[in-house]
C-alpha cells in the first residue's frame, strides 16, 4: 500500500506558516506565498546580520567624530594620535565614552593631541 505525504506535508506547511506569522495578508495565510516570503525573509536576515556590524561601526565613528570636533580635533587626527600614544581603545568604547563621559573623552583627546 502506498504511503501518502499527509503528516509530513502538514508538518512542513505548519513550520512555514508559523515562520510567516506577522506577515501581511496572503503571505501569512497561503502556503505558497508564505513559503516565498519566508525564504526571502531569511535571505534578508542573513544579509542584515552582516550589515548590522557595518552600521554600528559607522554610528560609532559618527559619534566619535562629533565629540572630537567639540574638542577641536578631526576624527582622523584623533585616531592617529591614539595610535601614536599607544592607547588601545576600540571605537565602541570611545563612542560610549564620548556620549556618556565627555570629561573622560576630553582627557583622552588631550593625550592623543600630545602624541601628535
Curated annotation (Swiss-Prot):
| Gene3D superfamilies documented for this protein | 6.10.160.10, Ribosomal protein L20
GO biological-process terms attached to the record: ribosomal large subunit assembly; translation
| GO MF | rRNA binding; structural constituent of ribosome
Q: Which GO terms describe its cellular component?
A: ribonucleoprotein complex; ribosome
Matching entries from SUPFAM superfamilies are given as: Ribosomal protein L20
Q: Which family does it belong to?
A: Belongs to the bacterial ribosomal protein bL20 family.
Instruction: Describe the task this protein carries out.
Output: Binds directly to 23S ribosomal RNA and is necessary for the in vitro assembly process of the 50S ribosomal subunit. It is not involved in the protein synthesizing functions of that subunit.
Q: What is this protein called?
A: Large ribosomal subunit protein bL20
Amino acid at each position: 500500500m502506498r504511503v501518502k505525504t499527509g503528516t509530513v506535508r502538514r508538518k512542513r506547511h505548519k513550520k512555514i506558516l508559523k515562520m510567516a506569522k506577522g506577515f501581511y495578508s496572503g503571505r501569512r495565510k497561503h502556503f505558497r506565498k508564505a513559503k516565498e516570503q519566508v525564504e526571502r525573509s531569511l535571505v534578508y536576515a542573513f544579509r542584515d546580520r552582516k550589515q548590522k556590524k557595518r552600521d554600528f561601526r559607522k554610528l560609532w565613528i559618527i559619534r566619535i567624530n562629533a565629540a572630537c570636533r567639540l574638542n577641536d580635533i578631526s576624527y582622523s587626527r584623533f585616531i592617529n594620535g591614539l595610535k601614536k600614544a599607544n592607547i588601545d581603545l576600540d571605537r565602541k568604547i570611545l563612542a560610549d565614552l564620548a556620549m556618556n563621559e565627555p570629561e573622560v573623552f576630553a582627557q583622552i583627546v588631550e593625550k592623543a593631541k600630545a602624541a601628535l
